[in-house]
Amino acid sequence: MWLLYLLVPAMFCRAGGSIPIPQKLFGEVTSPLFPKPYPNNFETTTVITVPTGYRVKLVFQQFDLEPSEGCFYDYVKISADKKSLGRFCGQLGSPLGNPPGKKEFMSQGNKMLLTFHTDFSNEENGTIMFYKGFLAYYQAVDLDECASQSKSGEEDPQPQCQHLCHNYVGGYFCSCLPGYELQKDRHSCQAECSSELYTEASGYISSLEYPRSYPPDLRCNYSIRVERGLTLHLKFLEPFEIDDHQQVHCPYDQLQIYANGKNIGEFCGKQRPPDLDTSSNAVDLLFFTDESGDSRGWNLRYTTEIIKCPQPKTLDEFTIIQNLQPQYQFRDYFIATCKQGYQLIEGNQVLHSFTAVCQDDGTWHRAMPRCKIKDCGQPRNLPNGAFRYTTTMGVNTYKARIQYYCHKPYYKMQTRAGSRESEQGVYTCTAQGIWKNEQKGEKIPRCLPVCGKPVNPVEQRQRIIGGQKAKMGNFPWQVFTNIHGRGGGALLGDRWILTAAHTLYPKEHEAQTNASLDVFLGHTNVEELMKLGNHPIRRVSVHPDYRQDESHNFEGDIALLELENSVTLGPNLLPICLPDNETFYDLGLMGYVSGFGVMEEKIAHDLRFVRLPVANPQACETWLRGKNRMDVFSQNMFCAGHPSLKQDACQGDSGGVFAVRDPNTDRWVATGIVSWGIGCSRGYGFYTKVLNYVDWIKKEMEEED
């Protein structure tokens, strides 16, 4: 609390001037020497100041001055804002004077003057009186400039706000009506509507001062920008009034409307424009006025609606729109598929799926595709077979059917147990665009070689030595080899050669792995065989029991040659079958041995054959011992022929097979392989018993299938 004293000169002589009080928000003012009697013949003015934006409020707490008529002798005078607020003296209850009591004195500005005046004495009827003086408190009170500026009677009023005034404790500020801009003086306003932006989904827009007359010289731009996918609708309200001319369209003032940068209307006059569907989320309203006019302007309400896309329509009867909706709007989508057996096509590209999305401009983001019938393409070629259409020839589309078949009688279709060849070969073009069989799926059938069925089986009974030439097709499995000299073999399947191991690794030679392997098939004449060409070998497999270094032991004399490429079977090239039971080795059973070996001590140029009986093993064993031979004759061998016969296999026939016709199946079986003997036409011949090696043969062949 500031205690402010009016200082008195030492001699209490009359004093003049003013005493400023430091600017504070509150304080007190007293007479000199208060509460002791104040001096005579004294006058001074106390200047009370509070911060700008506040008023001064003064209240006397104690007041005791010499009373007089009209407060002529001693008095306190209060003034503010260049006006007197009164002259006061006396005490509360005195018959003379004018005490202030508890009255509140208020300035309009931030200053108040308190003048204290005393005369030369304080006597009453010759008696000296003592008066205490006064004690007053002041405080800063908020000044409502906005209220005071409406009272323009002051000589120096505050600058007025042109439009709106806003008071706050200690000050005020000005603002402008919509469409106007506060100027640098912070009080005056100027019309400004060149860049008004509206982003709400709905609202009202009007000219300045609507419905009062709009200001002159306006260049207004009202922009409405809403979210993508919304379209704006404009509805003008009454009254609508823009200066016009009867003969010239909108020469003075005009309202122009643009949607997406395109002018969709220019309006003036008193006729309200029609409701506008802009089909856009961006609209600009340009309002221009000249320097004169007294029209009320315009007012509109804008609303938004989600933009809609046209109903999707298919291009053909095979396209399906899933869950078709009655209406599609922004961000909605539809999925198109095809009926079974058809596929989506966009341009020339095949689609696995199709989705179209409604865009913010009311269009679909991609065009409707079409559906094209699934095409399975050309059926795969069947090796050693072919196919025929059971539906329209050459048509490979959905539901087309083909029948695969094998080239008979040389091949037959591989079938599952209990199924027919006709079922195995039927393939249908499926809805997935793939040729399929009900049992095998996508995998095409397999044509297997037919074994042991020559189209021209042998009928003659002549023998190799003393016999005649074989005819084409008599022994279509016959193989001519030239490895370490002439040899033979038999075709198994369409890429395997069955032969004797000793033709690859002769007993009288050291083991060789780099010998040339020349193999010929498909003819009965050596020269013609050479013309047909050699068949490259992919792999050689010799039975592990074969021992090249044991000259008198032909145990395991069996080998397989895998051709690099499968051969194409025909009347002169067919495989022979493998045995499956012991009856093929019954005593006396007749078999045929064919070959390109020595004939009457001459090399044969044509294939020849001999018919021999299966001999008694004991007789063969006895015959061998009579020759003082130590050759091994095991259970994996059998013998054929007879010492009394002058026919036998000879050099160059090794590796060929002992072929027997199975009367039950009418198929030819390779029961033995020409292995060893003593000379030519000098007794029995010895053969590898193929039945004992069938498991090994099948295992070797299956490893490569």
Swiss-Prot record:
Q: Which PROSITE patterns match?
A: ASX_HYDROXYL, CUB, EGF_2, EGF_CA, SUSHI, TRYPSIN_DOM, TRYPSIN_SER
Domain spans labelled Peptidase S1: 464-702
Q: Where is the Sushi domain?
A: 307-373, 374-449
Q: What class of enzyme is it?
A: hydrolase
Gene Ontology BP annotations: complement activation, classical pathway; innate immune response; zymogen activation
What UniProt keywords are attached to this protein's entry? Autocatalytic cleavage, Calcium, Complement pathway, Disulfide bond, EGF-like domain, Glycoprotein, Hydrolase, Hydroxylation, Immunity, Innate immunity, Metal-binding, Phosphoprotein, Protease, Repeat, Secreted, Serine protease, Signal, Sushi
- SUPFAM superfamilies for this protein: Complement control module/SCR domain (SSF57535), EGF/Laminin (SSF57196), Spermadhesin, CUB domain (SSF49854), Trypsin-like serine proteases (SSF50494)
- Annotated InterPro entries: CUB_dom, EGF-like_Ca-bd_dom, EGF-like_dom, EGF_Ca-bd_CS, Pept_S1A_C1r/C1S/mannan-bd, Peptidase_S1_PA, Peptidase_S1_PA_chymotrypsin, Peptidase_S1A
According to its UniProt record, where is this protein mainly located? secreted
Membrane spanning stretches? none
Q: How does the record comment on the protein's domains?
A: The CUB domain 2 shows a compact folded structure in the presence of Ca(2+), whereas it has a flexible, disordered conformation in the absence of Ca(2+). Ca(2+) could provide a switch between the folded and disordered forms; low Ca(2+) could provide flexibility to promote autoprocessing and activation of CIR.
Q: How does it assemble?
A: Core component of the complement C1 complex, a calcium-dependent complex composed of 1 molecule of the C1Q subcomplex, 2 molecules of C1R and 2 molecules of C1S. The C1Q subcomplex is composed 18 subunits: 3 chains of C1QA, C1QB, and C1QC trimerize to form 6 collagen-like triple helices connected to six globular ligand-recognition modules. Within the C1 complex, C1R is a dimer of identical chains, each of which is activated by cleavage into two chains, heavy and light, connected by disulfide bonds.
- What is this protein's record name? Complement C1r subcomponent
Q: What is the lineage of its organism?
A: Eukaryota, Metazoa, Chordata, Craniata, Vertebrata
Q: Its gene?
A: C1R
